[in-house]
């Protein structure tokens, strides 16, 4: 096992994950905190949520030219979230009668910073009306600040629902996603119901950055505080299935007596599932995160025990509706989060099928 692949975050007595978790959103507004602080934003977010759930109402006045939209996404993953997101986005744009031109680049998460940078600069040179991107690393943040400060391109930040406090005077056009903290709290509540106090567990993070902080540390904070669970180890991964497999094996070699592993993403979880099967450790409970097609298949096979399922197409639809409102000169909320549902391997095929129809109502058709 190549230790260079992994960074063991926790390996010493006295580490306090709960104290670290209080800093999870340092520098960010929590989703509900932001809406509480700015009631007019809550009203706009609620109105957008209603539009997402409703049938599309076409644009009142067609645009003179196609609007230019550029998308740079970390799409090369087992998780189908990003691909479905674009599919639902385009289908809703079509139903809203919005004339558009889309340029999209899918990259590997965490690995292709150079490619992302080139694609982003190309999007700016082409004078895109809207740029859809994500925010996970410091390098991403520097680029976002460049866009906010020096271009007319309107920025949609995907997969983040916690506005950056430093940008309060000039926020992006829209933060859109499924609130990582809320999804992680829902999983923490379910694990808390299932296991007794002082249960041993391990965590497999995503790559270093925002997603690991919010999905991982939010969970750690809640189960340690509410259930007195005892964290034995935590590893950053490379956000891939292989690194999830490697991290799970490394973790269990040092701490074999855990009752569950908390995984922060689909790819990491499915890699850990392979490791557990190879080691004959099906007694260890493992979760998914996101509830895409690969996770739901694993749940129905009994390989995964539980996941928090995003109503996936909500965010693609929300982006299309926000652009429509902007073209109609209507105010657009700063932030939008889609809905979650908890799914377990005990759920009936009928319930899972109903949730799939709701979550993938555009991207499956």
Swiss-Prot record:
Localization terms from the record: Periplasm
Residues making up the signal peptide according to the UniProt record: 1-23
TM annotation in the entry: none
Keywords for this protein: Periplasm, Signal
UniProt KW ATP-binding keyword: no
Single annotated GO MF: transcription cis-regulatory region binding
InterPro entries named in the record: Peripla_BP_I, SBP_2_dom
SUPFAM superfamilies: Periplasmic binding protein-like I
Entry GO CC: periplasmic space
Broad class of where this protein is predominantly found: periplasm
Domain of life: Bacteria
Family statement drawn from the similarity comment of this UniProt entry: Belongs to the bacterial solute-binding protein 2 family.
Described purpose of this protein according to its UniProt entry: Binds to the signaling molecule autoinducer 2 (AI-2), a furanosyl borate diester, (3a-methyl-5,6-dihydrofuro-[2,3d][1,3,2]dioxaborole-2,2,6,6a-tetraol). This complex then interacts with the LuxQ sensor protein.
Name of protein: Autoinducer 2-binding periplasmic protein LuxP
Lineage, opening ranks: Bacteria, Pseudomonadati, Pseudomonadota, Gammaproteobacteria, Vibrionales
């Amino acid at each position: 096992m190549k230790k260079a692949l992994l960074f063991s975050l926790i390996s010493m007595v006295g580490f306090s994950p709960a104290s670290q978790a209080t800093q999870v959103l340092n520098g960010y507004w929590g989703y509900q905190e932001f809406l509480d602080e700015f009631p007019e934003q809550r009203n706009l977010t609620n109105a957008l949520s209603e539009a997402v759930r409703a049938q599309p109402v076409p644009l009142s006045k067609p645009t003179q030219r196609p609007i230019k939209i550029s998308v740079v996404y970390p799409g090369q993953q087992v998780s189908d979230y990003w691909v479905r997101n674009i599919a639902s986005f385009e289908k809703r744009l079509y139903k809203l009668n919005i004339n558009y031109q889309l340029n999209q680049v899918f990259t590997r998460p965490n690995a292709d910073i150079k490619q992302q940078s080139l694609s982003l600069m190309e999007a700016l040179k082409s004078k895109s009306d809207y740029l859809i991107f994500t925010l996970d690393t410091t390098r991403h943040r520097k680029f976002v600040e460049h866009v906010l400060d020096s271009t007319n391109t309107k920025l949609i930040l995907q997969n983040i629902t916690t506005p950056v406090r430093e940008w309060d005077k000039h926020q992006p056009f829209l933060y859109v996603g499924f609130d990582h903290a809320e999804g992680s709290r829902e999983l923490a509540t379910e694990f808390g119901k299932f296991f007794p106090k002082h249960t041993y567990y391990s965590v497999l993070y995503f790559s270093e950055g925002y997603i690991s902080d919010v999905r991982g540390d939010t969970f750690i904070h809640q189960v340690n505080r509410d259930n007195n669970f005892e964290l034995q180890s935590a590893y950053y991964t490379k956000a891939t299935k292989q690194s999830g497999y490697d991290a799970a094996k490394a973790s269990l070699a040092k701490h074999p007596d855990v009752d569950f592993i908390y995984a922060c993403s689909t790819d990491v979880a499915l890699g850990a599932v392979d490791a557990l099967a190879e080691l004959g450790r099906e007694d260890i409970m493992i979760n998914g995160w996101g509830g895409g097609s690969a996770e739901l298949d694993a749940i129905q096979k009994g390989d995964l025990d539980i996941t928090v399922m995003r109503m996936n197409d909500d965010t693609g639809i929300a982006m299309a509706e926000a652009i429509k409102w902007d073209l109609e000169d209507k105010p657009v909320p700063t932030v939008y989060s889609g809905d979650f549902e908890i799914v377990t391997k005990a759920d009936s095929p009928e319930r899972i099928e109903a949730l799939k129809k709701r979550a993938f109502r555009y991207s499956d058709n």
